[in-house]
Amino acid sequence: SAPTFGLCLAFRIGFRLEPKGRTGFAHLFEHMMFQGTPNAPKGTYDRVIEGGGGVNNGSTRYDYTNYIVSAPVSALEPVLWLEADRMKALDFSEKNLSNQKEVVKEEIRVNVKNKPYGLFFWTDVAGTAFDKWENAHDGYGSFTDLDAAQVADVKSFFESYYGPNNAVLAIVGDVTPEEAFAKVEKYFGSIPARPTPAKPDVAEKANTKERTLSQTDPLANVPAVAVGWKLPA
């Protein structure tokens, strides 16, 4: 089999850290990370990785946003260059932002608004179970908040949360730790740290009684039930 590697670059920014009035912003920014940089225009990231026999993806979670790559080990250095390049700067154009707002809104239409049950087992359960806004709000975001996002907001979000001091990079596969550390230092070592905002207190008090929510879904043909328990973070 051909030697391969897997890479995961995770930033400590997810739904919980979104500012109020900017619901869905962490997910929107995940999309912006694929819109190119001054050095690698839009499409370069995918073209280099896929052209080298690799695949890539990204996802936004409650506590982090991650970007993953799996490729032949010969592509490790180009991939590290690409990741370091977009950690330094992105193409913050109004055109890219407007385009990705519509992409995210279409995801909401497809996965939530026009899909049987939507994501009730995620968004509606969280909104019922938790008291603090950071835990309870819909991470997909409202159309109103997404439409209100400006290029200045994107730049501020990037500077606040996408520095090397707020990231964790993991590499596995057919590469030695010494080789991996040396290559990472080569491409990321000169990127300066950035100040990050104070993390909010997201701790919740234990529930003292059952919480329930009942709702109708005109798109669903049969009933559905979701049950959740609060567990230690």
Label the predicted regions.
Residues D91, K95-K105, R109-V112, P116-A126, ...:
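Non-catalytic accessory/assembly modules
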Residues G36-N39, S70-V103:
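M16/insulysin-pitrilysin zinc metalloprotease superfamily fold
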